[in-house]
Each structure stands twice: as structure tokens, then as C-alpha cells.
Amino acid sequence: MVNLGLSRVDDAVASKHPGLGEYAACQSNAFVKGVSTFVTGTGATFGLQMLVQRKLPYPFQWKVLLAVVAGSVASYWVTRVESQKCSNLWLFLETGQLPKDMGTDRRS
């Protein structure tokens, strides 16, 4: 058994897919970026709202809600983009081709 993060992967599976460790590290990095984007985006949006509260006053609960929604949207976008990069990496490690090259027809 090979340890892959918190889970264990059978040796046969790990030997069939030599890029599994790199893919797992990439996905882990993508999720960490997503969480940090959520925290940063929520905090930045909330701080920005506190700065403009004189011109556009509304209740505190709406400020929190708007900040959390903005942080969630930004986090989703960052995680989706980074996960797509990891999927492209996985395809490259498995096939040796980039995903854009897979659809082209090379005739000799």
C-alpha cells in the first residue's frame, strides 16, 4: 500500500499510474488556493463594504451575507480553474499529450 494523502492506494494501482502523486499534490494545492481565496475574498469584500457604508448604508447581516457570497463565488472560480489545470496535468502524465493535442487528427 502506498500512502496518498490520508488514504492508501494499492501498489498495483500506484504502479499503473506513476503520476498519481503529482496529481494528488496538484489537487491538494488547488483546494488550498480555493480555501484561501474564500477567506481573502470574504474579508476583502467585508472590508470594502465597511469603507463605503456611509454612502450606501444597509444592515450588518446583509454585509456579511454579501461578503460570504462574493468569497464563495471567487473561491469556486479559483478552485475550478486550478482543478482543470490538474486534470490537464493528469492527462499529460497518463498519455504524454496535452488535452488540446488529443483531438487533432495526425495523418501521415
UniProtKB/Swiss-Prot annotation:
Keyword set, alphabetical order: Membrane, Transmembrane, Transmembrane helix
Cysteines joined through disulfide linkages: none
Pfam families xref list: TMEM141
GO cellular component labels: membrane
Alphabetized InterPro entries for the sequence: Tmem141, Tmem141_sf
Topology class, membrane: Multi-pass membrane protein
Gene3D superfamilies for this protein: Tmem141 protein family
Keyword Transmembrane helix belongs to the record: yes
Keyword Transmembrane helix: yes
Cell compartments where the protein resides: Membrane
TM region positions: 34-52, 62-78
PANTHER family: TRANSMEMBRANE PROTEIN 141 (PTHR47229:SF1)
Similarity section: Belongs to the TMEM141 family.
Designated name of the protein: Transmembrane protein 141
